[in-house]
From Swiss-Prot:
Subunit structure: Forms a SCF ubiquitin ligase complex which binds to DNA replication origins.
Swiss-Prot/TrEMBL LRR repeat ranges: 300-323, 353-377, 454-480, 499-517, 518-542, 562-585, 598-622
PANTHER family: STRESS-INDUCED-PHOSPHOPROTEIN 1, TPR REPEAT CONTAINING PROTEIN
Protein name (record): Protein DIA2
Amino acid sequence: MSEDIIDRSLELGIQCFQGEDYKGAAELFSKSLQLARSYTDRSLEGIREKVGLPKRCLHDPSRVYHPRYLVLLDNRAATWEKLNKLDRALADAAYMITVDAYNLKGYIRRGKVLQKLGRYEEALQVYENGLKQAGEAEKTHAIHAPQKFLDIVYRQRSTIKELLQSRARSSRSLTQQTVAKEPKLKRPATIDSLMPGKKRSSSKAKIDYIATLPVEIIERIMANMDTRSIIRCYSVCKLWKYRLERLPHLYQEFRLSCCYKNMLGYVNFVGALASRTAEYSCRSIQCVSGNVQEEEKSIILLLSRLMIGTRQLALMAKKCKAERIIQHICENKKLRNGVQRLSITAPVHFGHKLNLHELYTRTTSMTHLELVLNFHTPSEHVGGHLFPWQDHAVAETNLESFTLMARNYSVHHVNVIEQFEYSSVLFKRLKKLCITGIDFRLGDRNNLKWISDMPNLQELWLERNTGIEFHELITQIVQVGAPKTLRHLTFREPPNRHFDRMDQSQLGLGEEALREVFQSLESLDLMNTRFDPQLLLLLLQPACENRIARLNIGNCPRLSFARDLEILTLIFQQLPALTDLLLPNVMEYTRQGMEVLRKNIKGMKLKRLDLSFIPSLKGYELLDLLKELKGINPLGLETLTINGCTAVAPQTVDYITRNGYAQKVMCAYERTQWEHLGINSFWYR
């Protein structure tokens, strides 16, 4: 229990430090240190052994400390530095070396504090001692210091040496000047022969490089400038304006912030370029929310007065409504005709005014659309009606990719759901569809027929949507027999969904029908989804021609690593072409489940493995698995991810990388929170 208190206090202290509450952080770290010192030696030995550390300190077997003691000291020393209490920081840094003389953290902390105090000779000696101890640890105990710590020590040592040498040279030079100093005659002021009575300026005349340099050199200068710098240069004088306007091919990518003054300068700048070059257009324009007070009028200014086309337009707003953004895009002929990739991140206040029909009709060149919408809760007095799609002719679009993300649930979802009734026309060419956070219970689209109306769909991503069930999706696709080109399927249910007991036998899915529609499947992601394991086995069998290269079955409530060992064996045997296996937070993890994976890993081509958030995963179990894999592939894994695996010690991670079991290991013990919404993050970071 007290271990949990120490970890919790450490986490709270870090939060206080990040929130700049340094006094609160120092107090929390001090209390945690006091608690860590309250253990008996026998208790500390048990705790250290539990996390994979030696019972006693390697550098001094007579000492034993809590595993978190060094981290707590380091954090408190950093806090003292922020509070400008360098003497206390120095004391904590010195004690860090006493706690673990083989860890370079203490030497780095102590050296930097000494540098702040101006005691450079002592700091240099500290860094030298740290490198000496690191060498001894490697020679005696085969412990390799992390490369990033070695780089810091070498860099700081080099900096101090250069500083001391510079001081020595300056001191010698000053001494020589003092000894050899002689009186010198002052040079009389030079009189300019062309300007009688006026002294010639000793300083060099300033040169206007933009006015004098060749165009080729100006191009190289301007090519390395950001949008803000370009606009400022454009406003310097008429000559600069004249020369910059004649280089339109340089200005292809713009990143703007919502400052009205800067936005006005940008609009005038591209307007001048367009007036000189009729066919001028740029590659991309990205506008991010800066000044919230000026955001709406800045975005409206951009969309209404922009006189050029752009192939890619990304707008991120916190206040400006998506309804107005879409309206102004549709009204700007130059903009709507040229945009191919459109991304809008904005709030929605009135869903019935979100005129997607007009957007599809007018942006005829658009192939990629991304909508990230924050739906506001409607007021009771606001009356809105669905946009009458049936009253308008629905034109065929060129969309190849469509992403629809809702940050919150709302009755306004019905206004974006209705478009899927016309999937056979709107999304006939669609290859990638991503929908997350939508409540499909509000409309009539929860029968999923609209998905089978997209014959060219290759990638389908459905995450945290309400009103859509996984078994219903599979049944619909199989019954209709479309889409047959599906290569990537991701289905993740919302959290806290009701438990679904639907079994595969109740679906009536035949193996031949499954093979017909899922024979091209290359990746399958069912994280956090409740499904009958037999259904997963059926989905993998059609891909027996070794197409499945990526599988994510982490956090699946009905797939147990304790009770479903036979099914797991069959699943892993169906994956001979697998390169990416993701098993974060697997249900009911047991050693027997890991043994099933180890025995069947020989039949895979594994390059990347994710075993994050399995607290009971032991280091020796992981090593047994990696040794089995290295017997097949001498190069080992490209990437091993074990975030949140608290039972795997840092020494084990170091051993894995040192012996080539994995080229890159991602291991962060602090990542203990699932993320609310993250389409490419597996819900945690």
